[in-house]
Amino acid sequence: VQYGETDYDFLCRMAAEEGIFFYEEHAQKSTDQSLVLCDTVLYLPESFEIPWNPNTRTEVSTLCISQFRYSAQIRPSSVVTKDYTFKRPGWAGRFDQEGQHQDYQRTQYEVYDYPGRFKGAHGQNFARWQMDGWRNNAEVARGTSRSPEIWPGRRIVLTGHPQANLNREWQVVASELHGEQPQAVPGRRGSGTTLDNHFAVIPADRTWRPQPLLKPLVDGPQSAVVTGPAGEEIFCDEHGRVRVKFNWDRYNPSNQDSSCWIRVAQAWAGTGFGNLAIPRVGQEVIVDFLNGDPDQPIIMGRTYHQENRTPGSLPGTKTQMTIRSKTYKGSGFNELKFDDATGKEQVYIHAQKNMNTEVLNNRTTDVINNHAEKIGNNQAITVTNNQILNIGVNQIQTVGVNQVETVGSNQIIKVGSNQVEKVGIIRALTVGVAYQTTVGGIMNTSVALLQSSQVGLHKSLMVGMGYSVNVGNNVTFSVGKTMKENTGQTAVYSAGEHLELCCGKARLVLTKDGSIFLNGTHIHLEGESDVNGDAPVINWNCGATQPVPDAPVPKDLPPGMPDMRQF
């Protein structure tokens, strides 16, 4: 990123970072000029020889070097660069580079560069080029010549110097030309045109590279607006990064190409856990820069403004802390709100659609006062093992239509005092095997109309003391085969008007006027000891017998009940 620097400074800094040097070339037969970018001395033009001659006054016609001074300086001996990338957080991100040609100095002068401005293996080249840049003037010679052909980008071979080790190939790294062409005053001789070339060279067995240049730093955080494609509300990549448009940006439109992808700082960030809130298109964010580097922006926060207002209405809701989202391309929201107003403290949760709660172990809810739940549609509760419900005082359960209760095994209901069950129309009870009712004191059964009892096999009734049956009108017993009655002491059968015992054609009738009628095909009287009969008049075989009277017809015999007179 070019930030706070001229175009030339930006290009020079980028070239130095990539180990590139550049020079100008002038065409020999035209005015054309070329800018040559190069990263190695090997591809410079072929070198040419130029002699050493300190006596320029006597040999002015020959291009030569009249001054040549060689010096060596202490420079950094090694470079260690290090950087970090969030895409490979476990990567060491370190590269070391030792300097070369260190015959004239010690080797413990290290340069440590962090951040190294690299995100991969290219950092090794950065370290090497930086090392070359720091040592680009460790060995340098400065000279003077009248030759205009000594300029950066050329190589020369010095010859004839009395110090033999200087007669070698050199790379020209700097050149400063000074020329004079004085005007001749009439009547005077004047002086001739002169050209002096003050140059600097380094040994040509190494590549000269520019020293690392300082990168402009951002003074502090900046404000920006999140951008994205037209019609999109949330625009991010797989890392949760977004794009923004800075307020100072005059050229880029507010779309998906406004900036590079920018990381977003979250309140908590762990491996698969933490907090995640993606800034949405149109929100104002605060962008800071790691180490002040314009190339490493990071969103540190968000802020409201006149058009993006806060939840609630300030300052009236100043006691509320709110986390409220917004439905994607909609008007709904989810919300978690804490209200700390004195005497009105509240925690409020709003789910726009579904709300799921998952507890892997225990959950305890403690409500000191009241608890109310309202469900608009259905509710399903599944308990894998046991459920205990304790109610201190009363429970009222109202079912609007139907209720189905299924118990897989046993059910025990204990009522400490009273139980009242009221069924408006019909109640049906089906027991698969056995049914037992135990009443400690008194049990009353009241049926307003009809009661029917059906037993598939046997029915047994056991009464500890007394047994009383009171029927308002009629009683009918129908036994398919045999009926036995056994009384331990006394059996009394009483009828107000008519008592009749029938078996086939035999009948025994007792009426309320004291008449006894015994009618049958054959009548046998046998006494083990005696047969006694007393009456004032005894008629025997004289036609004085009367017909047996019929029983009165029941007036309210229920439908389907048999008429006992037919037997």
PLM features: residue spans?
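Intrinsic-disorder/coil detector with helix-boundary
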Residues: 34-35, 44-48, 489-491, 497-567
